[in-house]
Amino acid sequence: MRLINTTTQTLAEFESADTPPYAILSHTWTNGETTYQDLAHERNAGKEAGYAKLDNGCKVAAAAGFDYLWLDTCCIDKTNNVELSEAINSMFQWYKNAGICFAYLADVPANADSPAADSPFSRSKWFTRGWTLQELLAPSEVIFLANDWTELGCKTTFVSLIAKITGIPSDFLLGEDLEHASIAMRLSWASCRKTTKAEDIAYCLLGIFDIQMPLLYGEREAGAFRRLQQEIMKTSDDQSIFAWMKDGPHKSINDSSARQTFSLLAHSPASFKKSGNIVEAEAPVVSGYLDGIRTPTVFNNKGLHLSLPIIQKKDRRVLAILNCSDLGQETEQRIAIWLCDVSTNGGRYIRVERQKFERIPLSTVFMSAMYSSISATKGEDEDLDRFRGPTTLQDTGHRGNGVSRLRPEHMVRSSGSFRKMGRRISKRNPKYTTYEPVVRNESMSESTPLMEGSTGLPHRPFMFIRESLAECFGCG
């Protein structure tokens, strides 16, 4: 790690184990910043503003008792791609390990009104930049400095206001483990932030998700963000990563120019702007007897593969139920997204209705999932054998043709019949019959099946009655 001596303003390099205590300076970049080459070769022509920032940063760090300062403009050789990649992948940890973080707000005057919802502090550019998100979250304390380098206050003092400005819950600003925030929630924190380089809107989030990946400048925002999501899914099964909405006018699925945008993965953190209140559900929607067949997310040359329960709808559409809900509604609802079959022979799907996702009460989920692929009407008999074959689920958002598979299978073996809204529907094929929904008492500590003649399936709260599994291959 490379640090600046606050007394001599020269560079010094340290191995990780030997790194001394240091302060760190967070700021927004402007023209004329001092670079590593400038400091190493003592070049200051035309860099007066950059050197003033360096000089003042060293002074406030020294006044706080630190012999060393880390400043990104000077401490990273950005002409060295290997060093740059290593630095960006390590930056969250460097901010976390700093003894103190000073945030210099160049657009906030010292004589400004006290920080409030509509003050220069709240409107500072610092709160709109991608890189400053981790610089706010990683350090245990952040001292905010006005444009004359006088102290405005600190993160712990302004925590309620900063939570309103950023949409980040106070607990996470004060050091709560970021792993306790859902993927959708964390991505929403970056939804209104900007970076100079398009790819950096993904790279600036590596530390937020404890992810490391190579930097590929030139892949554009969508490519970088797709790779970030893929890396996240390798270590997490949080399905809120699919709970995003796309702004803009709706595009018909028959519009060939829009096909490449109908992806299961978002193209930008901006799509999570309205997902800040979505949390991962504590208990899976899928009942215990199906947990064993839930496949992990797997990537191959066709895209990604995962298992989701679905509800069959008309017009070749299905609702894919995600194991997430609005905050405080984990026992009441689930988020679902729309998929649509766009193939001629059935089974190839894309994400549709991207401007919304559905909030489905669990009671509705139970009953709807029970009949998702039965299609019984007017009490007529239905042969379920036609649902046994696999179909293909396509996500055309991939650069090639992403493919998904839809398998209504793993039905519960049983005998007898079941009841829906007072009607009895007989089964000619006893091999694939189902359970009725369980009734939960107010304490949610017991569940009672409504059907006789079952095979002794363990009673569980939130039991799915009958399941179709959407094994979704999809790419961004």
Feature names for model-found ranges:
Residues 1-18, 27-64, 79-82, 88-93, ...:
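A structural "flexibility-hinge" signal
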Residues 24:
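Active-/binding-site microenvironments in catalytic and ligand-binding cores
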Residues 67-69, 101:
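Short acidic/polar active-site loop segments enriched in Thr and Asp
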Residues 69-77:
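Conserved hydrophobic ligand-interaction patch in extracellular adhesion modules
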Residues 74, 104-106:
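Acidic beta-strand-to-loop metal/phosphate-binding motif
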